[in-house]
Amino acid sequence: GELMIDLFNRLGYDAWTLGNHDFDWGPEKLDALLDRSASPVLTANIERGGARPGGFDGAWKRVLPWTMKDVGGFRIAVIGLITPGLPFWLPPDLLGGTEATDPAAALAAAVKEARSARADAVVVTGHMGWRFNDDYANPVRSILRDVDGVDVYLAGHSHQNQPSWTLHDVLCSQASYHGIHCGRIDLTFDMDSRKLVDRRAFTILMDDRFEPDPAVMA
């Protein structure tokens, strides 16, 4: 996992979201990766020892439910969610006391905070993918049905290239896996009212049109 964190740092990621495979090497390794990250780690729906994101100590202080970014003068809230499937794949010794909580409830609370902080748009990065029907690990349909105030959902986990679709009036996108595609979201605002007036999503195939970065390749 160290290589991926170093890559995130080099690319200047604003934030990233925990997924189930971040727990594969156990709690000590995950602590080291969190320490290594230069950016916050957004995961609203977890608990550790009764504490929630924003209230953790040690390396886990970097884990927050959401963050606010200024993009072109507009306030974009970014909220992270992890799949609730963690206990189905990972034994307690690897989870190290981390529990996945109800993603819809955690998201609703984070959206309320973000909107109270005058977010002009709310983007959710979820380690859950879209399928024709919800399942225990990917309840995206029900989450977006039950929680108001989300403008964009960036999906993961299900390893599919899904450039753009709309679900319960939320623009959704997933940029495949392993860096095969890069995702892009364009948000258009009215300059006077600051209202979001257009949303578009794309995925871009990372083929030989793009020169490899020598430092990354090394």
Identify the function of each model-found stretch.
Residues G1-A215:
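Acidic, metal/ion-coordinating pockets
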